Amino acid sequence: MAEAATGFLEQLKSCIVWSWTYLWTVWFFIVLFLVYILRVPLKINDNLSTVSMFLNTLTPKFYVALTGTSSLISGLILIFEWWYFRKYGTSFIEQVSVSHLRPLLGGVDNNSSNNSNSSNGDSDSNRQSVSECKVWRNPLNLFRGAEYNRYTWVTGREPLTYYDMNLSAQDHQTFFTCDSDHLRPADAIMQKAWRERNPQARISAAHEALEINEIRSRVEVPLIASSTIWEIKLLPKCATAYILLAEEEATTIAEAEKLFKQALKAGDGCYRRSQQLQHHGSQYEAQHRRDTNVLVYIKRRLAMCARRLGRTREAVKMMRDLMKEFPLLSMFNIHENLLEALLELQAYADVQAVLAKYDDISLPKSATICYTAALLKARAVSDKFSPEAASRRGLSTAEMNAVEAIHRAVEFNPHVPKYLLEMKSLILPPEHILKRGDSEAIAYAFFHLAHWKRVEGALNLLHCTWEGTFRMIPYPLEKGHLFYPYPICTETADRELLPSFHEVSVYPKKELPFFILFTAGLCSFTAMLALLTHQFPELMGVFAKAMIDIFCSAEFRDWNCKSIFMRVEDELEIPPAPQSQHFQN
């Protein structure tokens, strides 16, 4: 019974909804019928004659004033639309039409099944947009004290934004702290230091953490003088304090390397002890996870120091050993550091081997992966590539593979070619990047531009082919070719990550909506007509009469019909009628 009652209510509801959909037509005819019946009591004929008499007595100045007022209102609407579009990137009228008027006009289906499907689709798209707009730590980030601060001293500009540094502070708290830090005074101080906004306060806290360890060791060594050496080593120095000093206080890469080596000694000891105790409880397991992150970070930064100081082969060996020792820690993206170092050594076979492992469909892509693969493909044909020869004979198989690799890379990140071709100036890369965004393009080109220049003809091939990508994806925000549609959120996130003095690259270029252009043209044309009519009323009257005569003439109608038929023939490509045999000779 309950199911029958529910079905009857649903049918009744659908009937009511259907009747309300078409009820306005009934109301319209009822109103017309009432007006016709009440035309005599309401004196509709007299009122219409009065209105026509009033309109006949109006002077041209009234129409000029009316036209000017409408032009003024249209101009105000245009200015508001332009401001709203510049600020929010969309048309206000289009947004109101889609968001509010379309549901009222029946553009949204109220069916429950459709709602459930749309909600599932929205959740999938939201999940995809969140993953695409995730901010990643730059695997090739520079050193604050030795590189970023030196840039500030020379130019007076801040290369890092507050948002970028705040993300780094969150990363440091995630990697270098754990719940048991309050049990050790030095770690408790460093836990507060990572939250400090003032760089000098962070550096002072790091020195304080090291001094506390020194004081404790001096006090406790006499108490355990008769014990073994292993017991004396139970008071290690604070590795995270050395990390902070190497990152922010050291003014050269050599000084940073010395501090990282001291951090390595302290971090390695902590890692070995926590490795033995990790199975004793969740607290020890969290501490071991923290010590692992600290050790991996130190070794990676030591390899980057060696790369900066010209010891590239040593850096490659350290990175390979680190990837073998900790294969599951992919959050640091050490393979991108390895690819850059191998390209510096021109070890292209080793680069191809690394790409074969990480350029997989199941793994997340990056500009380094895609553009390095394109560089290797271009290297095989770039020295002999010529646009003129390719246009005459066509592309060979190797050239086609290189062009497809470039198109794939450009589709993933369309901002990179402008930096590689030096069409746009480079800045120091941020500490965090947004994949497929301008920040990732800067980070890639900053380190890989020299590798592209080293391969003869690679930049020429890129210059000749990269713009062809956009013909394959005419609507990149809606549908991609080899990747997901280009995320809309990149511009907003890049403006937060990149400094204000850098002009953020926007893709695709925002074009003014047709409504704004149409309103601007109509407003300008109407205002011009109103001004000319006010200044030269007789001349404009003659001109208007002449235009009306032209449009109403028979010759114009015949010409318009002929032009329409010619366009139809061009569209349909109708072949001409064959000539008679008598006229072929």
Swiss-Prot record:
| Bilayer disposition of the protein | Multi-pass membrane protein
| Subcellular locations according to the entry | Membrane
Positions bearing Phosphoserine: 386
Where do glycans attach? 47
Q: Keywords for this entry?
A: Glycoprotein, Membrane, Phosphoprotein, Transmembrane, Transmembrane helix
- Give the superkingdom in one word: Eukaryota
* GO BP of this protein: extracellular matrix organization; regulation of cell differentiation
Cellular component annotations (GO), alphabetically ordered: membrane
On whether Cytoplasm is a keyword of this UniProt record, the answer is no
Q: Write out the transmembrane intervals.
A: 15-35, 62-82, 512-532
Point out the signal peptide segment.
none
InterPro entries linked to this entry: ST7
Q: What is the reported tissue distribution?
A: Ubiquitously expressed, with highest levels in heart, liver and pancreas.
Keyword Lipid metabolism set for record = no
- Report the sequence similarity comment from the record: Belongs to the ST7 family.
What is this protein for, i.e. what is its function?
A: May act as a tumor suppressor.
Name assigned to this protein? Suppressor of tumorigenicity 7 protein
| Protein species of origin | Homo sapiens (Human)
